[in-house]
Amino acid sequence: VKKASPSLGDINLDVDIVQQAQTYEANGAVMISVLTDEVFFKGHLDYLREISSQVEIPTLNKDFIIDEKQIIRARNAGATVILLIVAALSEERLKELYDYATELGLEVLVETHNLAELEVAHRLGAEIIGVNNRNLTTFEVDLQTSVDLAQHFKKGHYYISESAIFTEQDAEGLASSFNGILVGTALMQAEDVAQRIKAVSY
């Protein structure tokens, strides 16, 4: 659930966030990602709180988390999963925040974009590893990022492909290597959200 992004600007400012989340849940989503960054994504922690209280499935606090206070706020707002971005943290700091979150009973999605970052996630022992198809420096997207990194996956991890997934063909191309996909913009822009969810589900 995101109203805007740095690369696209405003996406869907008038969306009823709770209704949107409930539509996701009703059509087979297993987790709902909620953007809470106010500056770049026009999100808010209250959105996470509202959605978490109105759905049964887990919610992910998708934000640029760099300290323990943010993790506490995420948990208090109802998140069961948080995002930690390898590119934004030293390996030592990543481990500190990962351990802190798991000690609080939270799951952690550890986001990577290249092989070096994937290796960091593996060394960390992250259970859930995301591959972001968007370069956070240039904002360019390429599904080949997921295809390439999938060659280096290891057993014992749950892999999620993130960003730039719009069509049934996009999803099908990832199904053999990834346990799940994170779809944001495509659903926020869709006229028929339920139909779009079914199109990208596998």
Predicted segments, located by residue:
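C-terminal helical cap(s) of enzyme catalytic domains, especially alpha/beta-barrels
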Residues: 143-153, 189-202
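Active-site mouth loops of central-metabolism enzymes
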Residues: 1-18, 58-66, 107-112, 160-161, ...
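Catalytic cores of alpha/beta
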Residues: 66-78, 114-125, 161-183, 195-200
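Glycine-rich phosphate-binding active-site loops on the catalytic face of alpha/beta enzymes
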Residues: 30, 73-93, 130-139, 177-197
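Glycine-enriched alpha-helix->loop->beta-strand junction motifs that scaffold or abut catalytic
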Residues: 28-29, 54-57, 76-82, 102-106, ...
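Glycine/Thr-rich beta-alpha phosphate-binding loop at enzyme active sites
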Residues: 3-14, 20-40, 122-150
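Hydrophobic faces of well-ordered beta-strands that scaffold small-molecule active sites
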Residues: 1, 32-34, 51, 59-62, ...
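Short loop-to-alpha-helix "cap/lid" segments that border enzyme active sites
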Residues: 45-56, 68, 89-96, 113-115, ...
